[in-house]
Amino acid sequence: MAGHSKWANIKHRKGAQDAARAKIFQKFAKEIYVAAVAGGPDVDSNPALRLAVNKAKSKSMPKVNIEKAIAKASGNSKSSSTYSEYIYSGTVSKGVQILVICLSDNFNRLSSNIKSYFNKAGGQLSKQGSIPYVYQQKGLIEIDKKLISEDKITEIALEAGAEDIQAEDNYYSITCEPSSFNQVSEFIEKATGFSEFLTREVSYIASDYVELDDESSEKVMAFIEKLENDEDVQAVYHNLG
């Protein structure tokens, strides 16, 4: 995998210990709901739902929460909410590329908030829906190094059909094509016996990173945190090195 971001890793460790799990679970529930509405409530026949459920399980989202989100979509629970996906991108602080994935039932609220965040950060929004050239969509699985040896996880990942595995400071990063992600991740889960992963999702990975001084980097990370705290934002990607 090309590139490396120390700021992503710092945030990664912080996120693993984050007490605000309820907010994270709300975002997962929304993703599960949208996938179930679009393709039906059967996990086995709905790849998008299976992806969303596996992602939630990897972060220890309670089974009852997952079932509730699916039931809501299948009509067993009354709701009038209709969510649509929106993608925003832009630059902040000397060329850092930000990609924001959103699910919202109120476009006007979302659009107003995103514009406000970028304006206050001195950033510049690109055309809505555009994805910066530095990003490539990949299936991504990250596993704590303490849980398994490099030789063993490399053997499993290659047998699963992964295209690349990298040993980072504290974790292994495994990537594959998005189209084969469910197959690869489920093979790795079965072969390792792990049900919880640091990351298990289809992600956007940057090929180039922008290096900034610590003060500027901290401002960018504060901006990203503000985006992530928005109820309509599902994920934020950046190429801060």
Curated annotation (Swiss-Prot):
* Keywords attached to this entry: Cytoplasm, DNA-binding, Transcription, Transcription regulation
Question: One Gene Ontology cellular component annotation?
Answer: cytosol
Q: GO molecular function, one example?
A: DNA binding
One GO biological process term is: regulation of DNA-templated transcription
Q: State the Pfam families in the record.
A: TACO1_YebC_N, Transcrip_reg
Q: What Gene3D superfamilies does this protein map onto?
A: 1.10.10.200, 3.30.70.980
Is-annotated flag, keyword Electron transport? no
Does the keyword Membrane belong to this entry? no
Q: Which family does it belong to?
A: Belongs to the TACO1 family.
Query: What's the protein name?
Result: Probable transcriptional regulatory protein MYPU_6240
* Source organism of the structure: Mycoplasmopsis pulmonis (strain UAB CTIP)
